[in-house]
Amino acid sequence: MFENLCTLPLSSELFTQTLHPTEPILAVGLSGGHVHAFRLPVEEQELDEHGDADGNGSVLSTGTSTIETEWRTRRHKGSCRTLGFSGDGGVLYSAGTDSLLKAAASATGQVISKIRIPNSNTDALDPPTLLHALSPQTLLLATDSCALHLYDLRDVSSFKSGKPAQTHYPHDDYISSLSPLPPTEMSTSGFSKQWVTTGGTTLAVTDLRRGVLVKSEDQEEELLSSVFVGGLPARGKYGREKVCVGNGNGVVTLWEKGVWDDQSERIIVDGGGKAGGESLDSMVAVPEELEGSYGGKCVVVGCGDGSVRVVRVGGMKGVVEDLKHDDIEAVVAVGFDIGGRLISGGGETVKVWQEKVEDEEEEEEEEQEDIEDHDDDVIGGSGKRTLEKDSDDSDVKADSSDEEDGGRKKRKKKKRGKKGQVGNGILGFKGME
C-alpha cells in the first residue's frame, strides 16, 4: 500500500517524465519546452555495527529534506513531448514539437548532439510521440506520421545526419505506447530485440532485424498504454507472460505472449467496462519487492480523472488500491525509481509515493487492541453460544465476524489519519524559482 510522501510543483504542464536507471533522479519534460532534472530525497544511510554505510537508502518522511534541482533548461521550442535515459543513465534523450531529437549528458544537461526528425512524406515537421533507448546500440523514436524510426547509435555519422537505420509503420495511427519484450534465453547480448507497440485500435510486434512481425485485429477501442509482465501463475490455457494494455474506456486487456491476434482477458478498472470509463493513459509494472503487499503481480495505471490505481493482473484480478494524484488533470506518466517509490505525474505536479510502513508504536497499539478484542470474545462469547445452540448459531458467528471487521476498519481509519499528517505536505525545493 502506498502513501503520498510529497508533491513537486512544476512551472508548466507536464508532458513526459522518465527515471534514471541507477540513481534517484527524475527528469520531466514540460509544455513550455523546458526539461528539468531533480534529485529525489533519500534517507541518510544507516551505519552497520562496524560503522560502515549499508548502502540502502529510502525516502525521508520527516518533511525536512528537499528535492534538489540538478539542472533546468529550455530544451525545445514548443513542448517537450518525450524523454528517455540511456541504459546506463549517462545520456538523456529528448524530443519536442520542434521536430528535434537531442542527446544531453544527464549529469549536466549539456547537449552532446542533435538531429532533425525526418518526415518521409513531406518537408513539414514531424513531431515525436515517444522514444525508447532499446540498447546501447539502438534508439527507437515514434512520430505523429505513424513512423517508427530506428537509430543505430554505433554509427556516429548516421546519427548526426539524422538518417535512421530503419523506418517501420506498424500502425495506421500514431504510436501511443512501446513495451520491450525480454530477450530470449538464446540471446548473447542480453538486450531486447523485439517490442510491442499500440497505436489507434491495434497492437503490433516489431523485430529489430525482421521489421513488423504481426498486427492484431481491430479492437474497436483506443489502446493507450502498455507494459510487459512476466512470472504470472500458469492457469489452464493461459501462460506466464503477458502484455497488459490500457484502453480508452477504463479496461486493461491482457495479451498472451506469442498470441498477438487478439486479447485473451479483460480487467475492468473504471466505468463498469462500458463506454464512458476513464482512459488509462499510463502504465507501469509494480516491482517484485512490492508484490507481497498486493498478493500477486500488479500494474499501476494513471487515469484520465487524476486517479492512480493498482491493478492485480495475476490470481484474483481487479483494482486493489485507488490513489488520488489530482482532482481534474489526467495522470500522463507513472514510474518507479530505484528505491521502489512510485512517481506519478500530471497537470502541473509530480507526486512521490512510498510503501506504507507501520511504526513501532502503531504496531504495539494494534497488538494490544487485538488482545483486548480476543479477551472480550472469550469472556462474553461462551455464555451467548451456550444459550443459542440452535439454527441461529450461524447468525451469531456472522455477527461476531462483522464486529471484528468493524474493529479492523476503525483501526485502519485511525492509522490513515495519523499518517496523513506526514505525507500530504509540499517539501522544500532547491533551485525552484
UniProtKB/Swiss-Prot annotation:
Biased composition (Gly residues): 420-433
Extent of Acidic residues compositional bias: 357-378
GO cellular component term, pick one: nucleolus
Superkingdom to which the source organism belongs: Eukaryota
Chief location bin: nucleus
Source organism of the structure: Sclerotinia sclerotiorum (strain ATCC 18683 / 1980 / Ss-1)
Subcellular location: Nucleus, Nucleolus
Region span, Disordered: 355-433
Residue spans of biased composition, Basic and acidic residues class: 385-400
InterPro entries documented for this protein: WD40/YVTN_repeat-like_dom_sf, WD40_repeat_dom_sf, WDR55_POC1
Positions annotated as WD repeat: 9-48, 75-116, 120-161, 218-265, 275-321, 326-363
Entry keyword set: Nucleus, Repeat, WD repeat
Biased composition (Basic residues): 408-419
Family: Belongs to the WD repeat WDR55 family.
Protein name from the UniProt record: WD repeat-containing protein jip5
Gene: jip5
